[in-house]
Amino acid sequence: MHLQKLKYLFLALFLWQCSPSEQYEVADNPLDGGRYFIENSMQGNFKKAKFYIVEDAENLALFEKMASNYFGLDKEGRMQIRLASIQINEITAVDSTMSILNYQNSFDKEVHKLRIISTPKGWKVDLKYTYGQN
C-alpha cells in the first residue's frame, strides 16, 4: 500500500515537471498586448516578449534583429533601457481586431508605434507595421 502511494507521488511530480513552467498571461486587450511586449523587450526578457508577437517568418526575423540590437549594447546601455519608463501616448482602434499603440520611453524619448492584432491566443504585436512602411 505504501509503495503504491509512493509511485503515485513520483508520477505526479514527474508530470508536474513535464508541464510547461512558463505560462504567460494572455493579453485580453490591445493595451495589455502592447504593454506586455514593450515591458519585456525593455527588460531584456525576449523569451517572454516573443510570446506577445504575431508569429510569422517576417515578424520573427524582425524580432531576432531587435533582440540582437539590444544585446549588442554595452551593459550600461541595456541598464538605461531597463530603467526607462514607458509612456503610452495614444491607443487607436482601427477596427475590432486591430489597434495602433503610440508610445515612447524615457530613455530615447522617440515616438514608436505598434500594431496590435487580436488572435485566438490573445492580442499580439505585428512588428511588420513598426519596422515596415506605415
Locate the predicted segments by residue:
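Sec-dependent signal peptide recognition
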Residues: 4-11
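Bacterial signal peptide processing site
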Residues: 19-22
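Short solvent-exposed beta->alpha transition segments
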Residues: 26, 31-32, 36, 41-94
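Exposed beta-sheet edge and beta->alpha loop/turn motif
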Residues: 83-134
